[in-house]
């Protein structure tokens, strides 16, 4: 920390965080450290090269890509490396234990962020809101704001606060908090992709889920018992509908459907796991599920003080209640021996995850964190760490996800599939989320795209199955969930056309798994989400911020939901359903029929990896991969990613990649497949790939100069068009070049 010059009672400090980020903190003597800092939410980064100098009443801190000038009165100017002013403030007013900050930005700036603070818009100028976790209205607020102008601001606070982005005063962003210091991380980055990279480098990248979590998750009816749930498993297999996760809703625990504490046991009437079967999963229903390749998810609710465990992990002492007997106590009545706590659930010495280990040992691999009570206000509660709810409320769902994720990892050594409806800044590094009890329409889509602007990638919602549009959207998400909580949404109970649509899209998603998994890994490395708003990918596209129902699904697939038109960015695009190519820069009608519920357009030059039909993903390496090439006159490439699907070995380089390039020149299209690099346990010995070219005038092909057999056929998502030709090759130690000739 650099102590800056200060007049008055404020303490002004600055800290170089990275080459593109500087932290500024203006505090009173009594302001405590933010819970996010105290509890290790931020990544530990090496100190970058920086300079610091005093110029009169100002302190100037410079890192490679940014410069912060702070006045002794709390005024500041934040600039990029060229000296261009990005944002500035005439001063931060500390008041009533909190602060009132007025920050100027450039006229005409487009501003994004705040997570789930609104589901009505993407761009935020002229918008004001309170950053406070709420049921339905705001499940996952995020205190990060950034602009296409090249600046970003992360408020390091969990206190209830309000943000006004030019709604009350043009080109002025006002942040008012009821408590805590004005503590911000300021970022300088030239574009959104770079900004998300820098932001998630500081706060944490999106978690990489188990491979099977990117398949289909089915939440069973709460009235189910063991027989009904096992029948659901069998029906997915019998109906030839791929699925990987089966989730239990309230009712799986004994004594209470809504069990808020740590005394849970299996409900022996609905989901019996007899004591004599403990330690022998093969004899239980969980073993039977595993044998047909399902992973069990358990529903949880909570009313438990997680702050004690956070204090312990932060290195602070948490003293359990002591039993104290007085020598003069004749009766030794235990009611008087310890403190009388209003909280009857929390056990000071027991981390919340501790009681779940036995269920993990029995075979549970996934936990659904319901909103019930984690997102509720607790206005009269004093938490164990000394915080009131004004400071703890936003923090609670974040540390809940943290303790669940790290608890599972530490207990098993495997990746966690923890998904929750509640969250706060940094949620992406611990859990997947779904859009809460708001269905699967256009507003949940807006929520997902807004969360993408906060670097959160593993998003989903409850799939709508009453129309093909809802099914289309439900499967074109980072992860897919069908909730059957109190309904009869099983696909085999749908009308015939909807049932066929569900089966079609489920199989389509599973064929697309290598692409989705590669994009998920890209998110985990860069902070760039799988689902991307149009303005994130095409910031110069006219009215991109108004296109809230369409989005890029990874690098190369454009889709939309619940609208009759889709606007194509500049360039050429291929209709995935028909194979027809069209020019971009225009709006076209969305044509749906039969099982098709929405559009899919492929960017010219794309290389989409797919695999064959399968009933589950599991953790196995991708085999029989087809590279679907949509040739362009510009050379394009794709790097396929794969790993063991379940461990954290990828963090240490245990993964493999295959790069493929393609370019069309005149009547020739040249595709080169590079040798596989890297390794992981369980990967296939041979590298055999099919290269499928989406061009129907091909008459021949060579592989490394020798004539090769080609076969005509359909694409990965269309049938009956016959607009592709394929060549299968084995790649060993040298690149393989395929030349297609028209």
Predicted feature locations:
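Aromatic- and carboxylate-enriched substrate-binding clefts and catalytic-loop regions
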Residues: 29, 36-39, 242-506, 537-539, ...
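Surface-exposed interaction regions enriched in Ser/Thr/Asp/Glu
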Residues: 728-742
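Short, well-ordered beta-strand segments enriched in hydrophobic/aromatic residues
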Residues: 14, 24-26, 61-65, 558-560, ...
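Conserved, mostly hydrophobic/aromatic
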Residues: 14, 144, 236, 404, ...
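Catalytic core of carbohydrate-active enzymes
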Residues: 406-407, 413-416, 425-434, 452-455, ...
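Catalytic and substrate-binding clefts that recognize carbohydrates or anionic sugar/phosphate headgroups
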Residues: 4-7, 15-16, 29, 51-211, ...
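Beta-sheet entry/capping signal
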Residues: 21, 58-60, 67, 143-144, ...
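Solvent-exposed beta-strand/loop surfaces of large extracellular or lumenal domains
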Residues: 34-50, 574-595, 702-726
